[in-house]
């Protein structure tokens, strides 16, 4: 467990405060998890963003009438801190009985509070339900590898040694799997996700990638660090010209977390998948 997470509200009984309380936000430094991967803030081999989508965003108009919307938050992958998920939920719940004169006032408040917690500017979009309905459900790009026949004997830790590639062939492709699962390092609750890998480099053996993804099944770590580990393991193996790893996790507590890591300029579709 991350030392800072021990002091967070995650996994503990919490009072649900219904009026605006920004102090509920609990930042967790990324540095310790970066260090586990041999990284520092100065040596990150990727660009990226963590998309958080909130499906339980509600506040009051000055008249007292409630409003509901979908909140989309983009936290830079290089920010000093992640925001612990339960504290994020408690903070958003504290808006429920708080009046805002305009949507713009709410957006500015969210931007200021979340940016202060993350240590970098956080993007905020407040979207109507009609807008989200019109978008529909997205599908991941490329080939789904989930029907490949593999044998699995261990789930306790990520196993990069399972990965293999054909160095004699250079390919550009996108592949994805819906079999990503890891566990919350604080509560041990399951985190279900889908992951897409896009790259140009030595031809990756698809069955080995699927076995590697499944090896995360009993691994305990935060969503962001799981994606960074996958990115680094593939980068070491493939030595690719380009590499992107993007995971979209199933929501819990009204929030889903979607980490994106890439060697390329950010170009991300934040539309929800079928399980989200």
Swiss-Prot record:
Chief location category: cytoplasm
Tell me which residues this entry annotates as catalytic: 184 (thioimide intermediate), 191 (proton donor)
Q: Which UniProt keywords apply?
A: Cytoplasm, NADP, Oxidoreductase, Queuosine biosynthesis
Record carries keyword Cytoplasm: yes
Q: Which GO terms describe its cellular component?
A: cytoplasm
Q: Per UniProt, where does substrate bind? A: 83-85, 223-224
Any single Pfam family the record assigns to this protein = QueF_N
Where does it reside? Cytoplasm
Q: Where does NADPH bind?
A: 85-86, 252-253
- The record's EC number reads 1.7.1.13
Q: Which residues form a coiled coil?
A: none
List, alphabetically, the Gene3D superfamilies matched.
Answer: 3.30.1130.10
Q: Name the Gene Ontology biological process terms.
A: queuosine biosynthetic process; tRNA modification
The pathway entry for this protein reads as: tRNA modification; tRNA-queuosine biosynthesis
Q: Which reaction does it catalyse?
A: 7-aminomethyl-7-carbaguanine + 2 NADP(+) = 7-cyano-7-deazaguanine + 2 NADPH + 3 H(+)
- A molecular-function term among this protein's GO annotations: preQ1 synthase activity
Give a short account of what the protein does. Answer: Catalyzes the NADPH-dependent reduction of 7-cyano-7-deazaguanine (preQ0) to 7-aminomethyl-7-deazaguanine (preQ1).
Q: Which NCBIfam families match?
A: QueF
Q: How does it assemble?
A: Homodimer.
Q: What does the similarity note say?
A: Belongs to the GTP cyclohydrolase I family. QueF type 2 subfamily.
What name appears for this protein in its UniProt entry? NADPH-dependent 7-cyano-7-deazaguanine reductase
According to its UniProt entry, this protein's organism is: Pseudomonas syringae pv. syringae (strain B728a)
**Taxonomy of the source species:** Bacteria, Pseudomonadati, Pseudomonadota, Gammaproteobacteria, Pseudomonadales
